[in-house]
């Protein structure tokens, strides 16, 4: 399709999309799903796609994997099934306490590194992975944080450095 889109810079890691006439005006609109992003709707107006916010859906980020369009209840309107990781994972993110991922070349080599973190009950940003796993991926951490106890009682900015975290791509 060589139609034009308005700003798509907010899209993150797209996993699936479906063309469907969600506004019932006779042309094919686009719905996009992905990780670290809300279900994103693009309304087709005169062969140009404009992002449209849908109340109750457009403000919820998820780990969306799939979308399917079908008239499931046979009432003449299109229904959508959206597959999301949901709560069946070891991280258990919530709207109040989301999972945070920082991604960058933390040890300045050619290998892209990720750091998983969550907010503690006291409001500190803490690593999810332990010292052993973290230092396997980013060896400089072994020199910076010497003991398991020190790692266990340190925050993400203390471990990785505030400047490195600010520079990194951040998903929540």
Question: In which residue ranges do the predicted regions lie?
Answer:
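Hydrophobic beta-strand segments that make up the repeating blades of beta-propeller
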Residues: 29-34, 80-84
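Blade-edge motifs of beta-propeller repeat domains
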Residues: 1-12, 43-62, 102-172
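Short, solvent-exposed loop/turn segments at the edges of secondary structure
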Residues: 12, 36, 62-64, 96
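Acidic carboxylate motifs that coordinate Ca2+ or other divalent cations, activating on Asp/Glu
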Residues: 25, 29, 75, 79, ...
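Short consensus segments that form the blades of beta-propeller domains
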Residues: 32, 58, 89-95, 167-171
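Structural signal for beta-propeller blades
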Residues: 38-41
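Beta-propeller blade termini
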Residues: 13-22, 64-74, 83, 103-104
């Amino acid at each position: 399709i060589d139609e034009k889109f308005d700003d798509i810079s907010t899209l993150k890691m797209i996993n699936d999309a479906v063309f469907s006439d969600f506004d019932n005006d006779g042309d094919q609109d686009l719905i996009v799903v992905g990780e670290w992003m809300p279900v994103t709707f693009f309304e087709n107006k005169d062969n140009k796609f404009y992002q449209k916010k849908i109340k109750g859906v457009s403000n919820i980020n998820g780990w969306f994997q799939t979308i399917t369009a079908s008239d499931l209840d046979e009432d003449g309107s299109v229904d959508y099934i959206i597959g999301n990781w949901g709560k069946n994972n070891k991280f258990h993110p919530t709207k109040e306490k989301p999972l945070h991922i920082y991604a960058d070349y933390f040890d300045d080599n050619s290998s892209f590194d990720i750091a998983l973190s969550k907010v503690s009950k006291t409001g500190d940003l803490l690593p999810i992975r332990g010292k052993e796993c973290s230092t396997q991926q980013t060896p400089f951490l072994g020199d910076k944080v010497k003991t398991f106890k020190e790692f266990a009682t340190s925050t993400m900015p203390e471990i990785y450095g505030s400047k490195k975290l600010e520079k990194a791509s951040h998903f929540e």
